[in-house]
């Protein structure tokens, strides 16, 4: 499978529904910012170039992006709104730096923290196998309200167009297959098509979805890849969705640790961030929080009611009801309950 020429991560939005002084994509989910998760997934496709498009609170967002990955190219979106315009700004920045747009270009979002590299690589693989000009991830939901609907060709099954909620007819609003918002494009077609995309829609924006419609009208292959795991494309618009995403990601982290030989007595009350490492045959008791780059060796008993932050715990340690931060515990250490250790 060929690797992408570029992955473009869109992170220019204000995220006003978060009701926060912080940009939406900077909010943490299980120990990593949303944009950090997006960049981690994008890097897993091994692209030639990784680009992030910014606008709202530009300096803060750009700093968080570069903290996660200093090799990311920062592109600035101008006053023209819309996802299509954001991608156009990214392409312009690549061209300004002398990079080719030939090959596959992936487009994803900075507020979809559960999307992983495996899913992006599967999209690229399907795009290549079908010889597609545009491929889009889709998913089928019970309630499609608010999402762009996927309109398919009844003969070929290709995606004809994507209709946004505000532009959809009553019949189109009954369709349950929705746009997950993650794309693979032929890079040169994408560049040319965006030059012809206008703002003739109810939002007055440059829609990226119009590129797909152009490809279909030009008799190109427009590929729809159905995503079975809806969480992979779940965006975050407010604090409620933030909590839901964090809970699901934490559940999956706990499951992975248990499959690797860690005993977690009550996963529902145990919170483990994404960079924590735990060896087999350690037991985690309820109401325990493991944060940062905490590492726990084999044979330990952690909790109940313990918080570890960037702690290194040697084999055979017992740490009940304690707060330990930035500290190394040697093997077989027993920490007294209600102890706080911070260095």
Which residues make up each language-model segment?
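Short glycine-enriched, charge-decorated loop/helix-capping segments at active-site entrances
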Residues: 22-28, 79, 197-200
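Conserved N-terminal catalytic core of the sugar/cofactor nucleotidyltransferase
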Residues: 1-6, 33-110, 114-125, 129
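Left-handed beta-helix
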Residues: 1, 203-343
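Short aromatic/basic micro-patch
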Residues: 28, 114, 184, 235-236
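Short beta-strand/turn micro-motifs composed of small residues
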Residues: 11, 54, 109, 138-139
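Conserved core of the sugar-phosphate nucleotidyltransferase
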Residues: 115-202
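Glycine-rich N-terminal loop/short-helix segment of MobA-like nucleotidyltransferase
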Residues: 5-29, 45, 68
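Residue-level signal for inorganic ion chemistry
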Residues: 9, 35, 50, 90, ...
